[in-house]
Amino acid sequence: MRWPVIILAVLVVVLQYPLWLGKGGWLRVWEVDRKLHEQREENTRLEERNAGLDAEVRDLKSGNEAIEERARLELGLTKPNEIFVQVPQKH
């Protein structure tokens, strides 16, 4: 009576090995699912960044307002008869 139980236990272990640890097993599926989730988050972040850059490019192509704004903010340029005042930030 003891040998059939041992044989069945060994058989169950042998049959379960590919399910849990083999190629396409649960551990591999879990790892692939985790990587898929990370990649989707990265894709979402990059899509948002691309949308912002696309909007900025369209603004720069369509009119002078965006160019003027960047020139004022980044280069400190002013219009004729305009005074530029810079207020230092408190630390």
From Swiss-Prot:
Q: Which residues form a coiled coil?
A: 28-72
Identify its membrane topology class. Answer: Single-pass type II membrane protein
Cytoplasmic side residue ranges read: 1-3
Q: Which GO terms describe its cellular component?
A: cell division site; cell septum; plasma membrane
Classification via InterPro entries: Cell_div_FtsB, FtsL/DivIC
The alphabetized list of GO BP terms reads: FtsZ-dependent cytokinesis
- Write out the annotated subcellular location: Cell inner membrane
Where do transmembrane segments lie in this chain?
4-21
Alphabetical UniProt keywords: Cell cycle, Cell division, Cell inner membrane, Cell membrane, Coiled coil, Membrane, Transmembrane, Transmembrane helix
User: What Pfam families would the database entry show?
Assistant: DivIC
Q: Which residues lie on this side of the membrane: Periplasmic?
A: 22-91
State where it is primarily located.
Answer: membrane
Its assembly, as annotated, is:
Part of a complex composed of FtsB, FtsL and FtsQ.
Protein name, entry field: Cell division protein FtsB
Which species is listed as the source? Azoarcus sp. (strain BH72)
> What gene name does this entry carry?
ftsB
